[in-house]
């Protein structure tokens, strides 16, 4: 396990590090560094048409990389972020094609773990897909992750902080809200905070 200073140096040099979120471990790298992103795709054996999310540290960051945001976006942010929620918005021209595979949308994540948030604030935006080989279960245990990647990666260990449930993915890019992946935040949780939101059944 490396110190935060060393993890910052690895990220700054275009490397990838394993970091805890409130859900599962992620494999993080600098999002605006194409070679760093390519390195994560290769480590995970991830198909190139499978887009990455942007891990950011503020509401302003979300606005910086999206467009045509719904008027209730700030309410969702205030109610659930940072936390186990990924939101999908229309991407603006600041989002590199190597992040979202040239799609019209991009996902945003604000993990609720102090070390990871600090590193995102310092070196972000970062990509941070789950720390596992594609097709394998999401990474819950630091030592198992390092073993799975043949000890090619290092990071910050905090197994006890993880829920072990992936984040809910909420698509806000259309006229109605869609839950693309059910995680710990449910439709009922969202409606309790924002009762006027209209959901589309997937």
Predicted segments, located by residue:
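Active-site-adjacent structural elements in enzyme catalytic cores
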Residues: 1-202
């Amino acid at each position: 396990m490396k110190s935060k200073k060393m993890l910052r140096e690895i990220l700054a040099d275009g490397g990838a590090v394993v970091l805890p979120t409130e859900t599962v471990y992620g494999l993080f790298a600098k999002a605006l560094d194409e070679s760093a992103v390519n390195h994560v795709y290769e480590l995970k054996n991830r198909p190139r048409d499978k887009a990455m999310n942007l891990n950011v540290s503020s509401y302003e960051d979300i606005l910086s990389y999206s467009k045509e945001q719904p008027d209730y976006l700030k309410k969702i942010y205030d109610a659930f972020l940072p936390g186990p929620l990924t939101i999908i918005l229309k991407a603006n021209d600041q989002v590199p094609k190597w992040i979202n595979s040239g799609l019209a949308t991009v996902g945003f994540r604000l993990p609720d773990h102090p070390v990871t948030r600090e590193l995102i604030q310092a070196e972000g935006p970062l990509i941070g897909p789950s720390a596992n080989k594609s097709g394998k279960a999401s990474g819950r245990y630091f030592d198992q992750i390092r073993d799975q990647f043949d000890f090619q990666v290092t990071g910050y260990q905090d197994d006890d902080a993880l829920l072990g449930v992936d984040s809910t993915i909420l698509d806000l890019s259309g006229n109605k809200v869609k839950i693309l992946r059910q995680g710990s935040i449910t439709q009922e949780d969202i409606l309790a905070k924002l009762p006027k939101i209209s959901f589309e059944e997937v």
